[in-house]
């Protein structure tokens, strides 16, 4: 517990919080170019082949980002939009790629949660 005099001399220091997505630099999204598109395996209790891409962003950062949804059309040199948000069972993956934006198409035949996967409203029969 500081004395009043110590507080007058130094004041209180605010705790600096570390960003969970530093490559965004405070912005909501960032454009980038895929340098590598591949699959990787998740941490211990889970088992799958998760689709990820290494993306070089416009601000020079190179990040690993997750491609959500079933199936994708990404390849090297595809231009994508990256948002923040980590994947809990993939270490080092702290970003998501936005579906239905720039070169990445939305998920085909998606009926529910369409806005999250860039899917258009299905036509009435």
Swiss-Prot record:
Part of the 30S ribosomal subunit. Contacts proteins S8 and S17. May interact with IF1 in the 30S initiation complex. One of its GO terms (cellular component) is small ribosomal subunit. Residues 113-125 have a biased composition (Basic residues). Residues 1-31, 105-125 are annotated as: Disordered. The modification 3-methylthioaspartic acid is found at residue 89. One of its GO terms (molecular function) is rRNA binding. It comes from Methylibium petroleiphilum (strain ATCC BAA-1232 / LMG 22953 / PM1). This is Small ribosomal subunit protein uS12. Belongs to the universal ribosomal protein uS12 family. GO terms for biological process: translation. Signal peptide: none annotated. PROSITE patterns: RIBOSOMAL_S12. The keyword Signal does not apply. HAMAP family: Ribosomal_uS12_B.
């Amino acid at each position: 517990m500081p004395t009043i005099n110590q507080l007058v001399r130094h004041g209180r220091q605010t705790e600096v919080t570390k960003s969970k997505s530093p490559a965004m630099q405070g912005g909501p999204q960032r454009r980038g170019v895929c340098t590598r598109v591949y699959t990787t395996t998740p941490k211990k209790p889970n088992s799958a082949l998760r689709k990820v891409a290494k993306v070089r962003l416009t601000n020079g950062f190179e990040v690993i980002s997750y491609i959500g949804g079933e199936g994708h059309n990404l390849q090297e040199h595809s231009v994508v939009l990256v948002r923040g948000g980590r994947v809990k069972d993939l270490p080092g993956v702290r970003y998501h790629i936005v579906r239905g934006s720039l070169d990445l198409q939305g998920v085909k035949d998606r009926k529910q949660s369409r806005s999250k996967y860039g899917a258009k409203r299905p036509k009435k029969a």
